[in-house]
Amino acid sequence: MRVSENFALRVHVDEVDPLRMALAAERLDYEIAVLCLELEAERLNIDDLRWLIEEIRDIREHVESVLVLPGCKLEAESAGALRRAIRRTRPLVYLLAVGGGDPKINRAAVSDTRVDLLSHPERGNPHAGLGKYEIELAREKWTYVEIDLSRLFRREGERLAWQVSRIRDLLRLRRRKRFPTTVALGARDPLELIRPKQVEDLLKLMGFEDSEVKEMCVEAPREILRWNAACKHVFTVPGVVSLG
């Protein structure tokens, strides 16, 4: 059984044709691409996700070398709205992320086993955005804390330096506390996609070791998707069992 190595994790198609994004992922040698919509928990329209699923079914006729899966990222203002949105979206997606930053949302996300990723917990914070309690919850519930590379590509000058510093804060914290961590592209346009080798080089420039790059870019995405395919979902995509 072939083991997949190149994951385009959390690639957004809110404002771009999903087929165009999938073809771009194929051109850059990705083997698995998770196409996502960003949805507001308080104003959730589940038909948006159903549309994405139908688009992905059609994509399979045009893209053969990339396994394309549906996902979503929830943005919420309250923990209650987040929990309700998780309940409605979880059965439809292979990847469920929550946009972090607000301490109460960070905590609610890592408290819920149905959540795969807590994205950018540092948003709006002068530090990595995780306290001792949130770290313990992430380890206990096996919720991955995500490093969002797109937040680097959309910044310059002092804002870019700030973002690099927050990623390094998270890396240092992760080395001490050993909580689940992964890396996502977060691209919202095909032009924001970069090759897997470029992802690896970028992480190494920020101080990641080879073993950390492999663990966060290959082993973590594979485990997330394999677990969800086996345990959580009614919607299935032919070939997902070949995740390795």
Curated annotation (Swiss-Prot):
Keywords: Cytoplasm, Endonuclease, Hydrolase, Nuclease, tRNA processing. The keyword tRNA processing applies. Its main location: cytoplasm. It catalyses: Endonucleolytic cleavage of RNA, removing 5'-extranucleotides from tRNA precursor. The keyword Nuclease applies. InterPro entries: Pol/histidinol_Pase-like, RNase_P_comp-3_arc, RNase_P_p30. Pfam families: RNase_P_p30. It comes from the Archaea. GO terms for biological process: tRNA 5'-leader removal. It is an enzyme of class 3 (hydrolase). GO terms for cellular component: cytoplasm; ribonuclease P complex. It is found in: Cytoplasm. Its EC number is 3.1.26.5. Signal peptide: none annotated. Belongs to the eukaryotic/archaeal RNase P protein component 3 family. Consists of a catalytic RNA component and at least 4-5 protein subunits. Part of ribonuclease P, a protein complex that generates mature tRNA molecules by cleaving their 5'-ends. This is Ribonuclease P protein component 3. The gene is rnp3.
